[in-house]
Amino acid sequence: MLFFLLEDPFVWNFPLLAGLIILCAIYIVLLRTYTEIKIYDKQPLLFFLSLTILYITIGSPLSSINHLSFSLHMIQMSLLFFVIPPLFLLGIPEASLLVIKRLNIPFLAALVTFAILFFFYHLQAVLTYLSLHSYIHNSYLLLLMVLSLLIWQPIVTEQNKRFAFLSGIVLLPACSLLILSGLFGSGTNPLLSGMMASLCITPSALNSLSILPPPFNTRADLIIAGLLMMGIHKFALLLTVRLKNKILARDLTGSG
C-alpha cells in the first residue's frame, strides 16, 4: 500500500521545483550585485538548504507519507514552521532583514495569530474539513508559513530570548491537545481518512489495512506527535542561535 502511494510520478511537484530554482537564481544575482558574500559562504548555503528541505517536505513523494500518521505529519509541520523559516532568514543578508524590521510589523500579534490558527488546525473537526478541501487546506498552511516567517524574524535578527520563550509557550496548547487526544481521544487520523477517500477506499476497508505498524495511527502516535513538536521547536531555537553566532563571527573575522 505504501509503495502504491509513492510510485505515482505526479506526486513530484515540478511547478514548485521550477519556482524554487527561479528563486535561487534571483537570490544569486542579488547576492553578487549588492553584497560581497560568496555563494559557498554559510548564509547562501543555509538559504539553499531551507529551499531544499521545503521541496522535500511538500514537493516530493515523501509528502504523501506525512498523511499516514500524526507523528509523521507533525514532523512535516515542524519542518515547515520551525526549521525552514529560521534557515531561510539566516540565509538573507543582515541589511535586508533590517529593512523588514523598519516596517514595524507587529510580531507579537503574528505569534498569537499563529498559535490560535495552529491550535485550531489540529482540532479533529477542522482537520477533517481541511483534508477534504485541498485548496482551503493549502491556503491555511500558506498563511501559517507566512506567519512563521514573521515569528522567527525577531529571533533571528535580534536573538530576542523573550520572544523565543514566548514562541514555546504559545505552542503548548497545540502540543497539549495532541497529547490529551492520545490519552483520552479515539486516536483517529482525519488526514489518512481524507487520503483514502481520494483513493475511493471505504472506511471498512481502511480499518482492515495495515499501512504502518504500531504505534502509528494509535493513541500513542498522537502523544509522540505532541512531544515531537515540542522537541523539534526547542532544537530549532538552539540551532538558530548557534548558526547566528557563527554568521556574526564570520562577519567580525571577514572569513566565510
Feature names for model-found ranges:
Residues M1-G256:
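Alpha-helical membrane segments of multi-pass proteins
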